[in-house]
């Protein structure tokens, strides 16, 4: 797994934010799937600007009190779109997931996203909370039901 520098991370997330805005932001994708009994069932996933920060794996920087500082998901996304993101605006996740997410981010932010597998997540990994998973053996995206909107969104 490649370890990215902050400058490399900025280049990736700024470039991908432009594609995310064009391809997914404010849109829903409908996947039609078949189960082993050949029954067809739909999965609809919706994408919004406030989901982008989580997709990158980057975290808001911590303040002097050890709590996350005031960079919110929408602010982060707008800074990416405006090409104004700086190294001080984010941190890498301590568990290493940021680097994994940055490596696959350019491949999962397109409306022509193909998923070889879609299904319920079985909670087999203790630090991953999600309800639905869509992807392949190379990358996947987790989704949860947003209780306010009653839509599945990336988490």
Question: Where does each model-flagged region fall?
Answer:
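An acidic, glycine-rich, mixed-charge low-complexity segment common to nucleic-acid enzymes
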Residues: 1-128
């Amino acid at each position: 797994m490649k370890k990215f520098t902050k400058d490399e991370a900025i280049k990736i997330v700024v470039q991908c934010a432009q594609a995310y805005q064009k391809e997914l932001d404010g849109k829903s994708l409908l996947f039609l799937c078949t189960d082993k009994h050949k029954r067809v069932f739909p999965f609809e996933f919706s994408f919004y600007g406030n989901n982008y920060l989580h997709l990158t794996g980057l975290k808001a920087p911590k303040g002097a009190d050890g709590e996350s500082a005031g960079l919110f998901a929408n602010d982060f996304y707008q800074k990416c779109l405006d090409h104004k993101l700086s190294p001080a605006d984010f941190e890498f996740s301590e568990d290493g997931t940021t680097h994994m997410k940055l490596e696959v981010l350019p491949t999962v932010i397109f409306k022509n996203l193909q998923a070889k597998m879609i299904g319920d997540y079985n909670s087999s990994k203790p630090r991953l909370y999600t309800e639905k998973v869509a992807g392949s053996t190379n990358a996947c995206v987790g989704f949860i039901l947003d209780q306010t909107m009653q839509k599945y969104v990336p988490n």
